[in-house]
Amino acid sequence: MVANNAVISVTGKRFDESVGLYLAICVVPKKGLAPTPCGGGVNKSGVGEGSFWISSNPPPYGVGLADPFKPGGRFNYKIRVSQKIGKFDCKKVKCAVTVRADHLRSEDRSYDLYLPITFK
């Protein structure tokens, strides 16, 4: 269990470095659907602590916005978690630390990972 507005560490390893990922806290969707909504929104500025774009080969517009993987498909981020994601309350709906393929493979559900999170 975590407290609202807490900062948690998320570490990943052995991810496919040829596939960009998003990392965020999201409402767990119905099977087969993309995780959404997600806290932190779409991180277009490349700064912040609510969501992250991880890609070692982003398109030209993503250079400087996406963070590259560390060797071995690794990453480590600190994410600020909020009990509320838009109108959804994570005490009432299932939420998770979520990894998914980025917008270049937005329909590919094979990269989706969910680590359930509960709030105090």
Task: Label each region the model flagged.
Residues 1-120:
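Extended, solvent-exposed regions of the mature portions of secreted/cell-surface glycoproteins
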